[in-house]
Each structure stands twice: as C-alpha cells, then as structure tokens.
Amino acid sequence: MAQMTVQVVTPDGLKYDHHASFIHAVTKDGQIGILPGHINLIAPLEVDELKVRRVDDESHVDWIAVNGGIIEVKDDFITIIANSAERDRDIDVSRAERAKQRAERVLEEETKRVLEKATKSDRNDDVQRAQIALRRALNRINVGTKIR
C-alpha cells in the first residue's frame, strides 16, 4: 500500500511522526486532501484541525489541533511546521474551555471599548459637522450683510 510520512514540528520539537494513507488540512485557500503521490506543494495553514488516516490502521484517524503554520508536501513526505500543535489525546479540554471563556471575555470588553470610541468618534464627527455648518452660516450672514 502506498503511504506518506507525516511530521508535525513546532518550536518545542517533533509533535507527530507517523505513516499515513490520507491527510486532510485547511489552508488559507481552503480545504485540501492529500494522498500518496500528491504533487509537491507548500501552503499556509489556517488555525484548524489536521486529520491523518494512519497506514497501520485504516479505521484509525489521528486528529491534531494546528495553530496555523505551513504544510510542505514533497515526494510523499509531509511536513507541517506550526507555532503549536496538539494531538487530540493530549488536549486538556477543561483548560481549553477556560481559555475560550477568557478569550470571549476579552473580546467582549474590546468590542465595547471600540463601540464606545466609535460613539465618541461619531460625536466628534457631529461636532465637526456642526462647526462647519456654523462657519458656513456665519460666512453667508457676513457676506449677505455687506454694504453694497
């Protein structure tokens, strides 16, 4: 059976190294399925899951959370370089939930802050428009009352 070697590398070292018959990844340009004999390529990855169907057990799929990075396919050797990557079995789900809640809280606070700034900016725009309208009116009055 044709196979590929798949390695996932992070700054912390090699995170995954197995033989595979199929890989599914999400690149910046969309989803990609890779089989043995795939053309050589390099593509930037989205923050998404990586699906690897292993050769030693066709019914077994390894799922890896990849934090962006790049994928290189060259002669049935697939290298994924990412800032971080975790296999499904290594992920602490409760810790991930806490991180999600923190991120949502920060996002909500930042959204409120942006909206408050936008409101102030809108107010500033309203003030500026009023000042311009006042200057135009004063100018028209001044010109209109000139002695001819």
Curated annotation (Swiss-Prot):
Localization per record: Cell membrane
Keyword terms: ATP synthesis, Cell membrane, CF(1), Hydrogen ion transport, Ion transport, Membrane, Transport
Protein's membrane topology: Peripheral membrane protein
MF-aspect GO terms: ATP binding; proton-transporting ATP synthase activity, rotational mechanism
Gene3D superfamilies: ATP synthase delta/epsilon subunit, C-terminal domain, F0F1 ATP synthase delta/epsilon subunit, N-terminal
Gene Ontology CC: one annotated term: proton-transporting ATP synthase complex
Chief location of this protein within or outside the cell: membrane
Alphabetized Pfam families for the sequence: ATP-synt_DE (PF00401), ATP-synt_DE_N (PF02823)
Family: Belongs to the ATPase epsilon chain family.
Protein purpose: Produces ATP from ADP in the presence of a proton gradient across the membrane.
Oligomer status and interactors: F-type ATPases have 2 components, CF(1) - the catalytic core - and CF(0) - the membrane proton channel. CF(1) has five subunits: alpha(3), beta(3), gamma(1), delta(1), epsilon(1). CF(0) has three main subunits: a, b and c.
Name of this chain's protein: ATP synthase epsilon chain
Gene that this polypeptide is encoded by: atpC
